[in-house]
């Protein structure tokens, strides 16, 4: 029959694996449409295809207690009892989150306390969102790590009573389980180590090397340079100045006025030079004396006439 457990199935927690689900809920599952149409004749390989089609998790819902496909596949896995390696691959699957949730619930129902902590605690680092259907048939939003936390600490998940789980600290004291290290602690350790490395690098940069000390030594006998030459202020060019930098500045008209010599001044200077050159030459003195003392005949006639008129 379709509702019987396989012959070579092992008892779990001293009982038939299907009996881990309550009889009322188990009966509702056997009578559901999904169980009769989709779960008939399924094997461990075919369960994977059905698990990939899941879109939400949940137990039973509605007034007449209808089971969800997630709950039906859970009971089917208890019935066929797949190998542990297949369940571990379900849990490690990162592409399909509902396949992972199905494997986690089955591991919690059938696995030992050590296996539950070993395979389920790493899923605390999965923060993906999943849909959950409540008793009223409404969908709620939750995360993968919340679902894992309920599996490890709650008594009932998806309307299934979970087996008792041994406390973690008891297993740690018995040295059967190592203390759990969360991903947050690992990140904090990485941050602290990186900060320590940065501080060490800064200290090494602050400590001057012997070469630097030799360079910084100053001879007291040598005269000290003026601070203006040493600490020369660099002019910061504005964008406007940068644009004008390739072109050379034209001299201001005021400077040009001082530099340029006026023609009048130039003439006077040239005359002085000529006069000096003539005064130095001996011929110039003679000609000058001759011009100053000797009179022309016309000029002498005019002076003679003027003297005559004065006498008359």
From Swiss-Prot:
User: What start and end residues bound the annotated signal peptide?
Assistant: none
- Tell me yes or no: is Ubl conjugation among this UniProt entry's keywords: no
> Annotated Gene Ontology MF terms?
RNA binding
At the top level, the lineage of the source is Eukaryota
Keywords from the UniProt entry: Coiled coil, mRNA processing, mRNA splicing, Nucleus, Phosphoprotein, Spliceosome
Where is this chain primarily localised? nucleus
- Show the segment(s) annotated as N-terminal protein interaction domain: 1-179
Start and end residues of each stretch annotated as Disordered: 181-312
What's a Pfam family in this record?
PRP38
Q: What InterPro entries does its record include?
A: PRP38, PRP38_C
Bias type Basic residues, positions:
225-294, 301-312
Q: Where do Basic and acidic residues bias regions lie?
A: 203-224
- Coiled-coil stretches are 170-204
* Bias-annotated ranges (Acidic residues): 184-202
GO cellular component terms given for this protein:
nucleoplasm; nucleus; precatalytic spliceosome; U2-type precatalytic spliceosome
Phosphoserine PTM positions: 11, 193-194, 209, 226
Q: Where in the cell is it found?
A: Nucleus
Gene Ontology biological-process annotations: mRNA splicing, via spliceosome
Instruction: Relate the protein's function as given in its record.
Output: Involved in pre-mRNA splicing as a component of the spliceosome.
Describe the subunit structure: Component of the spliceosome B complex. Interacts (via N-terminal interaction domain) with ZMAT2 and MFAP1.
Which family, according to the similarity comment? Belongs to the PRP38 family.
* Name the UniProt record assigns to this protein: Pre-mRNA-splicing factor 38A
